[in-house]
Amino acid sequence: MEVPRLDHALSSPSSPCEEIKNLSLEAIQLCDRDGNKSQDSGIAEMEELPVPHNIKINNITCDSFKISWDMDSKSKDRITHYFIDLNKKENKNSNKFKHKDVPTKLVAKAVPLPMTVRGHWFLSPRTEYTVAVQTASKQVDGDYVVSEWSEIIEFCTADYSKVHLTQLLEKADVIAGRMLKFSVFYRNQHKEYFDYVRDHYGNAMQPSIKDNSGSHGSPISGKLEGIFFSCSTEFNTGKPPQDSPYGRYRFEIAAEKLFNPNTNLYFGDFYCMYTAYHYVILVIAPVGSPGDEFCKQRLPQLNSKDNKFLTCTEEDGRLLYHHAQDVILEVIYTDPVALSLGTVAEITGHQLMSLSTANAKKDPSCKTCNISVGR
């Protein structure tokens, strides 16, 4: 079942007791997590309702979970409702002046356990939460008898599933625009980066863990290893732009060296950074590689010859490449890439740091690139 939200109803088990309002609960006060009741409470005397214990959380998704617990059989038949206190786990490093998330208080009828708690308006992907439970018995006058709070349990919600990513993919399809020809992938970095690759990695760029840019629920952030490339071209020249936010030195490599019939293509994310520009993250993985296996389990696979973002087709024995015009593609290649397969040269344009997407946070209010999952 889906549990309804009680916005201003239950007192938190981690705070002093407060009156429950709405839902005809005006006269009730709940215990805090230490089991203390207000001395002047209007609540009926507790009749030893069983306290939930041995709480189990499973079937966790990015916006739902199942919860169950054990309880003594004594007075079990008098339980009519469950009160659930759900809070984001406190981040000690968070900005103290930032508005705190309002704790979510849920009330549910006493259905058979396990019970599903679902709601994208109060559950965010890849986020740590604490949860505690009370049992309650509704009286004829509308008041409740409640148990003490259970122990506090911690859990973390999951990443976006393939289903959620497919929803993002469908939204990205809408704005991708027409396709433009291109012939090279490129990667900008500082000169020191390429010197380090030559001196310490045998002249081969190595995959590294993807940063946390993009959607908060993306399954590749902080997990997928790869090398970042671009393929955007200037409309009037058909060549890569001379400006870059990532460094004045550019490695260029022929497109067929990275993207060919021996690789698979995956959709990774769709996001923006409070601007009109939208970004699509794609992953290219050699067939059967560790990166390919990682993506196959987590990401929607694209038809390399027919999709709205990046294509590789054959014509007269040659491979032709096209990229979407109206989104900025960020391409992640999951294997090492030898510098000898391409060229490194200094660009003639500017280093536009303001356009960097390193650890960029997605605009959660954008209707173009958000789905109804998490906040």
From Swiss-Prot:
Alphabetical list of Gene3D superfamilies matching this protein: Immunoglobulins
Sites where a glycan is attached: 22, 36
Alphabetically ordered keywords of this record: Glycoprotein, Phosphoprotein
PROSITE patterns, A to Z: FN3
Record domain Fibronectin type-III: where: 51-160
Pfam families linked to this entry: fn3 (PF00041), PHYHIP_C (PF19281)
CDD domains given in the database record: FN3
Keyword Glycoprotein: yes
One Gene Ontology term, aspect cellular component: cytoplasm
Task of the protein: May play a role in the development of the central system.
Family: Belongs to the PHYHIP family.
Protein name: Phytanoyl-CoA hydroxylase-interacting protein-like
Organism: Rattus norvegicus (Rat)
